Amino acid sequence: MHPDVSADLSELDTTLRTVESVLDVEELRRRIDELEHQAADPELWNDQEHAQQVTSQLSHSQAELRRVEELRTRLDDMPVLYELAEDEGADAIADADAERHSLREDIAAMEVKTMLSGEYDERDALVNIRSGAGGVDAADWAEMLMRMYVRWAEKHGYGVEVYDTSYAEEAGIKSATFAVKAPYSYGTLSVEMGTHRLVRISPFDNQGRRQTSFAEVEVLPVVETTDHIDVNENDVRVDVYRSSGPGGQSVNTTDSAVRLTHIPTGIVVTCQNEKSQLQNKVSAMRVLQAKLLEVKRKEERAEMDALKGDGGSSWGNQMRSYVLHPYQMVKDLRTEYEVNNPSAVLDGDIDGFLESGIRWRMRENQAS
């Protein structure tokens, strides 16, 4: 085996051992045994919410253990694979190299998962997208971003539940709220918070001029009962109205859409994608609780920043630029990570941006 290959495999082994140590594989196996015991209890489903938490945790833990065990098996098999390849010739060696490169990417992705250790990182994500400056192009851009995140979730087999979509009159959306349901989706997608900028030839301009558009992405953790985010009913004004679709046309004959206004904070939440008013109210309350949790977290962060004597983070600033004209490039302005294939990115191929963002955030946290 070539010395460079041997050195690379040794480096991969060191990285994987670190991953195994952080995950604490033996503790993970013990946790799976405990969850399997709970799942086998016939009385578990007497409390459906708790039962769903148990089965979800079990499924996630089993998948995590399976991934790290598969990586270990693949890495341990690499020396044998190269030994056989050297006997078979150049094509076999090329195949072994391809497997080694693929293994490196998979171990790096698993390493990134170990960096998601924040208080809420394991939660589902609640994503809010709002169009900014740029008129109809900005509304179209907001809808393109929503599709990008939904496609990313679909490619990974994650669930998506849309709570509200406010359509613009000509094209696109004014705003949208949806949940991405998968372990660590909040920790992963939270690096997407900020302003996303699009530069392109406007399809809505008869003169074919270049247009710059902006959209804001907000990512919140889905609230759980353990968060104790209690909302006083007297503090919430409830308005109902008919759901509307593109162009403002009504899509429901009953007042099923719900708007909640939290009077003390001025936070407004709408939900119209469910068929019944009750379902929309439940979903809207879930979003309101997530926003109130974020208010609480911001207050805590402000106190910590004051104690540390710094100005805090600048998540509200531009964080990524998508240029479709006069050249093709998507570039993260924080990490400097960039790709020259915007079409793939807008179709949900954003793992590279997410991984580089998570690594950047970890470095920033360590430096602060």
UniProtKB/Swiss-Prot annotation:
Naturally occurring in which organism (per UniProt): Rhodococcus jostii (strain RHA1)
Pfam family, one: PCRF
Name recorded for this polypeptide: Peptide chain release factor 2
N5-methylglutamine modification, residue list: Q249
Main localisation: cytoplasm
InterPro entries for the chain: PCRF (IPR005139), Pep_chain_release_fac_I (IPR000352), Pep_chain_release_fac_I_sf (IPR045853), PrfB (IPR004374)
Keywords on record: Cytoplasm, Methylation, Protein biosynthesis
Family: Belongs to the prokaryotic/mitochondrial release factor family.
GO cellular component terms given for this protein: cytoplasm
Gene for this chain: prfB
Subcellular location: Cytoplasm
Origin organism lineage: Bacteria, Bacillati, Actinomycetota, Actinomycetes, Mycobacteriales
PTM comment, free text: Methylated by PrmC. Methylation increases the termination efficiency of RF2.
Summary of the function given for this chain in its UniProt record: Peptide chain release factor 2 directs the termination of translation in response to the peptide chain termination codons UGA and UAA.
